[in-house]
Curated annotation (Swiss-Prot):
GO biological-process terms attached to the record: regulation of transcription by RNA polymerase II; sex differentiation; synapse pruning
Pfam families, A to Z: DM, DMA
Name the record gives this protein: Doublesex- and mab-3-related transcription factor dmd-4
Compositionally biased residues, Polar residues: 232-243
Organism this protein belongs to: Caenorhabditis elegans
Location of the protein in the cell: Nucleus
UniProt xrefs under SUPFAM superfamilies: Cysteine-rich DNA binding domain, (DM domain)
Lineage: Eukaryota, Metazoa, Ecdysozoa, Nematoda, Chromadorea
Length: 260
């Protein structure tokens, strides 16, 4: 229950709403509300021992905040990789950015004023469906099993090969993807080397294919055909003379036939 700036508990205890105060003014015995006070603080250039201690503490706090924000970003990236890899997550892990102690509030009063938060940018209605679409695509990727994801990315390999490599990687999908990506890269490099060597040989020996490749296709029937040899003119005339003499020898008008 709230009454003005007072918070009333059920047991009747009243607690005022806490407002951060300027630490530099507090060191010099003044009480100043921190909101909108940074530019007008008359002790902002003070170099006394207490104010120097506050400045050093502010630098340490700023470094801690930057470290926690970077850790939260890395956790978000790791969580996205887990979702893409298809690993089941029961609940979202608590990031280190939320593990801030309550006793540091007074030390960070002045720091809160120095760290200027960016105003929230208005989100147009056109960008909202795009964000929802990205979330839906992430959920669709998480529905793939590891072996299905590998089969989608490396369809040139057989399924049992993908299963063996995934088993050798102890179920680590990212390691299996890296392995197959390296295999594909080496294969492409070898193909490029072979193509370059063939192109080089073609430039050096342009007629090499005429000696290697036959001009006509080989048929087994060509072995069964009787070879034809070229016959000279003298051989042809002698052959004709022999044929005519043999015919005359057995002709019915010959003397041999009459004597018989």
């Amino acid at each position: 229950m709230m009454i003005g700036n007072l918070h009333v508990f059920p047991n009747g205890r009243i607690e005022r709403e806490r407002k951060p105060k300027c630490a530099r003014c507090r060191n010099h015995g003044l009480v100043s509300w921190l909101k909108g006070h940074k530019r007008h603080c008359k002790y902002k250039e003070c170099a006394c021992e207490k104010c120097n201690l506050i400045a050093e503490r502010q630098r340490v706090m700023a470094a801690q905040v930057a470290l926690k924000r970077r850790q939260a970003t890395e956790d978000a990236i790791a969580l996205g990789l887990r979702v893409v890899a298809g690993q089941a997550i029961d609940r979202l892990p608590q990031g280190p950015v939320w593990n801030t102690a309550g006793g540091e509030d007074e030390d960070m009063d002045y720091l809160d004023e120095e760290i200027e938060e960016k105003p929230p940018t208005p989100v147009s209605e056109e960008l909202v469906p795009l964000k929802r679409k990205k979330v839906e695509e992430t959920y669709e990727l998480s529905s793939f099993s590891p072996i299905e994801l590998l089969m989608t990315l490396f369809c040139e390999h057989e399924k049992h090969v993908l299963e063996l490599v995934l088993e050798a990687c102890h179920g680590n999908v990212l390691q299996a993807i890296e392995h197959f990506a390296n295999v594909r890269r080496v294969k492409n490099i070898n193909q490029m080397k072979l193509f370059a060597a063939a192109t080089r040989m073609d430039h050096v020996f342009p007629n090499m294919t005429n000696f290697i490749l036959p001009k006509q296709s080989f048929l087994i029937d060509s072995l069964l055909e009787q070879p034809t040899f070229p016959v000279s003119s003298q051989a042809s005339t002698s052959t004709k003379t022999c044929d005519s003499s043999s015919v005359d020898s057995i002709s019915p008008n010959s003397s041999t036939f009459e004597s018989s």
